[in-house]
Amino acid sequence: MKKVILLDIDGVLVHHGGYRAALHATLNHFASLMGLDHFDFPEEKLAELEKRGIFSEWDMVPLLLATLWNDILAHRPNLSLPSDLSSAAVELGRNLNGYMPRELIIPEFEYIAGQYPAEAALKHGCFSSIPMDLRVNILSQSRNINLSQTMRLFQHYSLGSRVFSETYELPAEVETESFLLTHDRSYITDAIRARLRQPNIYLAGLTARPSAPPREVDDSHLGYAPEAEVALKLVGLADIPLIAFGKLEYLAAQRGLDAGALIKPSPVHALAATVAALTGNEWAGLQAAGDWFQTGKLNGAFADLPREFELFVVEDTLGGVRSTLTAGEILRQSGFDVLTHTIGLTSGSVSKIESFTQAGIPYFDNWELLIAGIGL
């Protein structure tokens, strides 16, 4: 029987040291403006955010920054701040008077369907000690390179200054190398890659990383950062189909949709990746999944799929797990005989182990155990 295996990238194919380093560099940029030596959250704290469904550093950075500033302003309630983040950081630094919080806790808030976590926190009224204009500038438009100062700075560190300017046609605001190139490393060996490339196994990337548009289209790549493609090249899987954030953004732009409603845990993400894996065509997968999103029917490329196959997903968080479980159910309701397997990869992380245990998802600490455990 054919096996489709959907592969997350960060925490599954690569150790995402680049994104974590870019996160810390972005936070420390603002810390420096405040006159502080550093501002860091330990990895387990960041893993707890992922456990809550906050997977992207584009959300983590504004939420962490807002948490720090809200705590400071709760102890400086009458401090007036400009709405520009850099200017606000300088002004906050002038008024610290030696105060620094010992423990920072990001508030709980309800997620809003189709909305990114940072913006959901804003809608929920979190960080009320921060003046509204500044709060909006921190938390809103978290994927807009022109409007989000945190995203724009983070992308400098992820891509490097030169590629940042080439990708977005914007002048570099800081000079830096690409942390993706200097800090990411592969989790898979040649032996693991060979097991994944066996006959009757069909692979596709399933990631929230930015990416180029679908490889079958010939439109401009302006604003599309090829970060997912960089990772697949690093692990020796550059040729497999990929459904990443940039691909979903492209589909959303073509159809007047919100990309946030298409990305995992939305089943659109896994449906598109499943079609792409079996057909080798990213754009066909995206269009077919987009049709389901808009009509509730599996049309187009789904007609060309085998009626029976196994659907695996390997994830380090629950977003892709939920996307794939729902996609499998949609396929079965449409007459496909699909057996769904959700596999967690923890790399020994306590919070990831707890998350998968609570969700009843089988998990493994490393790829060697995973390959043996699922019988590949």
Predicted regions and their residues:
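Surface-exposed alpha-helical segments enriched in charged/polar residues
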Residues: N28, A66, D190-R197, V275, ...
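Asp-based, Mg2+/Mn2+-dependent phosphohydrolase catalytic module
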Residues: M1-K3, V217-L376
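Phosphate/oxyanion-binding active-site loops and adjacent basic polyanion-contact surfaces
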Residues: H15-Y19, L23, G53-E57, L180-R185, ...
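Short, surface-exposed acidic
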Residues: S32-L49, N70-D84, L237-I240, E282-A289
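Substrate-recognition element of Asp-dependent hydrolases with the DxDx(T/V) motif
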Residues: I5, V12-L13, N97-I105, F109-L251
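Pocket-edge positions in alpha/beta enzyme catalytic cores
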Residues: L46-L49, G53, A261-L262, P362
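Non-catalytic pre-domain segments flanking phosphatase-related domains
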Residues: M1-L7, S32, P62, A66-R152, ...
